[in-house]
Amino acid sequence: MQYHVDGELVAREDATVHVEDRGFRYGDAAFETCRAYGGEVFAWDRHLRRLENTCETLEMPEAVPADLALRVAETLDANDLADAYVRVSVTRGVQPGKLTPREEVDPTVVVQVKPLPRGGTDGEPVWDGHATVQTVKTRRVPSAAVPADAKTHNYLNGIMARLELRRVANEGYQPDEALLRDVDGNLQEGTTSNVFFVDDGTLYTPATGELLPGITRELVLELAADESFPVETGRYDVDDLRDADEAFLTNTTWELRPIETVDGLQVGTGPITALLQRLYRERVEARCYK
């Protein structure tokens, strides 16, 4: 396996960053997780825009290289991968060990890939079953503290939530995802996913502001609008999710993953989830395999 590090393809075992890199030292970096289907990165323009927006939030607006798409393509080609997970990281680079960053930025740019199954209408899911989700005590860091719409390397909030999952897990109960609430107790998101639920034919999802608006979330809302589904975004309690007719998680790798249980209570899939899954796969097929 080869990765792209600062403009050069290197073997995975030789892919390193400097110990004084601020991405390593402080999590001072932006990243995007993308998915390639048939050799093409799906929704690349949206991922690139969010990466650039995160870098602007971090006050390093020129950090994303103009040839980033080429670096991604070279990494896929070097590994002979058409269907793949793609992670792009842009750090503030190597700087002295002071919390306040320098204004001048010499970014470290890394592209990592790994194989995934084919997607689209003839594909298969990367997950091995419907999701078991668990509400955790860890709360979503308020956007006033760390901007929710910035996708940065600092994932300690999600890590603490996943550690809670590990503590509650046992031989018969292995949750796949932790659900985070805000400080007021409102449902927000999973640690690496957005959440949707269906009740009486209406599709619901928490409003942006205190969560990371996922690219797959955005696409699902567009697909629902195209089908004239009633859609509402707002503030919801975990009980709204537990009592739903259908529920699912979204992220770039999972696409749409139905939720089987919430805190041990059965929820499951249904016709709206199934239709949105099909429409999403059809869009992938049309954009990337034809």
For each feature predicted by the language model, list its residue ranges.
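Active-site pocket-lining segments that scaffold enzyme catalytic pockets across diverse folds
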Residues: 66-122
